[in-house]
């Protein structure tokens, strides 16, 4: 939300509620740390990929990158997720390539389709972990989001920060977009900066598109084929302008853009009305998993891959591999 990027009269009106939010969260954290509230310790190490702010900071590309890197190094990894946006009431549940994004959420389906990783969804993280460990022999559990879910003990914490928006106006909810104060970053093992300029002790990540994929046929074409071409773009992610800016920076001529709420389900007529049949409709990979059943001929999604420097890659992975004895 733009109002969270600066201070205004609304900010100060909401500030007392932010103070209350912060106090409650601190009391809750204290109770977990003193073991007054129970928390679950997984039999295998747990790595959390999360953030301290609301909205899309790029956690899912980090999870995909991490899973792929670990798989290449022989680590048996599983992923757990809340399954935001899914309608299923059957928890815990394994997500497969045949799972519906409408039922289990768009991000879990995307992660499984990209990596083939064992993945379970549930609001109860313990149930998800137990389901995975009952069916797979795993070395490590990665949790997609859940930094503030202190009912689950963790061994490693990574935080993803939006390198452009950073921490907005610096207030916690509802006056600002923070779930926790930036001082929380002092306690995590890695800070990943998504775009912009990485600050000290942060690892810069860039999200790079290489090709576009047709939703109907699976045809791939270089993203450069769309340079100078008139297109329409949609994005149902935490921060839609990031996707639109990426396309425009590549040279795509966007006639129209439409942002949607994160995890929003799409109606076929809603999207068909946005672009004429001959105009390409570009979307994120996360949106595509919700649109395949009614996709039109000229609809394309643009997958992005997380990229790190060799130095950051080594710095991020070595502590994990050392802990696992790999």
From Swiss-Prot:
Listed Pfam families: LpxK (PF02606)
Chemical reaction(s) catalysed: a lipid A disaccharide + ATP = a lipid IVA + ADP + H(+)
Write the Enzyme Commission number(s) for this entry: 2.7.1.130
- Which branch of life, at top level? Bacteria
Q: Which residues bind ATP?
A: 53-60
Q: Does the keyword Transferase apply?
A: yes
Cite the entry's keywords alphabetically: ATP-binding, Kinase, Lipid A biosynthesis, Lipid biosynthesis, Lipid metabolism, Nucleotide-binding, Transferase
Molecular-function annotations in GO: ATP binding; tetraacyldisaccharide 4'-kinase activity
Its GO biological process terms?
Answer: lipid A biosynthetic process; lipopolysaccharide core region biosynthetic process
Q: In which pathway does it act?
A: Glycolipid biosynthesis; lipid IV(A) biosynthesis; lipid IV(A) from (3R)-3-hydroxytetradecanoyl-[acyl-carrier-protein] and UDP-N-acetyl-alpha-D-glucosamine: step 6/6
Q: Does the record's keyword annotation contain Nucleotide-binding? A: yes
SUPFAM superfamilies according to UniProt:
P-loop containing nucleoside triphosphate hydrolases
InterPro entries per UniProt: LpxK, P-loop_NTPase
User: GO cellular-component terms in the record?
Assistant: plasma membrane
* PANTHER family named in the record: TETRAACYLDISACCHARIDE 4'-KINASE, TETRAACYLDISACCHARIDE 4'-KINASE, MITOCHONDRIAL-RELATED
Q: Which family does it belong to?
A: Belongs to the LpxK family.
Function, as annotated: Transfers the gamma-phosphate of ATP to the 4'-position of a tetraacyldisaccharide 1-phosphate intermediate (termed DS-1-P) to form tetraacyldisaccharide 1,4'-bis-phosphate (lipid IVA).
- Annotated protein name in UniProt: Tetraacyldisaccharide 4'-kinase
Upper taxonomic lineage = Bacteria, Pseudomonadati, Pseudomonadota, Gammaproteobacteria, Pasteurellales
- Gene, per the UniProt record: lpxK
């Amino acid at each position: 939300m733009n109002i969270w990027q600066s201070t205004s009269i609304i900010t100060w009106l909401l500030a007392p509620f932010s103070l209350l939010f912060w106090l409650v969260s601190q009391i809750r954290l204290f109770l977990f740390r003193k073991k007054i509230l129970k928390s679950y310790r997984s039999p295998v190490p747990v790595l959390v990929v999360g953030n301290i702010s609301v909205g899309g900071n790029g956690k899912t590309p980090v999870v995909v990158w991490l899973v792929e890197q670990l798989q290449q190094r022989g680590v048996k990894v599983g992923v757990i997720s809340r399954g935001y946006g899914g309608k299923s009431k059957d928890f815990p549940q394994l997500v497969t390539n045949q799972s519906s994004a409408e039922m289990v959420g768009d991000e879990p389906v995307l992660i499984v389709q990209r990596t083939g990783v064992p993945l379970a969804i549930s609001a109860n993280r313990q149930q998800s972990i137990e389901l995975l460990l009952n069916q797979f022999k795993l070395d490590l559990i990665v949790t997609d989001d859940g930094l503030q879910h202190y009912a689950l003990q963790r061994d490693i914490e990574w935080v993803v920060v939006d390198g452009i928006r950073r921490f907005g106006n610096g207030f916690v909810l509802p006056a600002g977009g923070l779930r926790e104060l930036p001082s929380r970053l002092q306690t995590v093992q890695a800070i990943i900066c998504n775009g912009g300029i990485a600050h000290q002790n942060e690892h810069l990540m860039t999200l790079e598109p290489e090709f576009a994929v047709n939703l109907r046929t699976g045809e791939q074409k270089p993203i450069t084929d769309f340079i100078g071409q008139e297109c329409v773009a949609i994005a149902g992610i935490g921060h839609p302008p990031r996707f639109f800016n990426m396309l425009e920076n590549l040279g795509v001529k966007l006639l129209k853009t439409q942002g949607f709420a994160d995890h929003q389900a799409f109606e076929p007529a809603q999207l068909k009305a946005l672009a004429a049949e001959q105009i390409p409709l570009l979307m994120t990979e996360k949106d595509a998993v919700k649109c395949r059943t009614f996709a039109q001929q000229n609809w394309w999604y643009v997958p992005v891959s997380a990229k790190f420097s060799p130095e950051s890659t080594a710095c991020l992975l070595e502590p994990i591999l050392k802990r696992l004895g790999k």
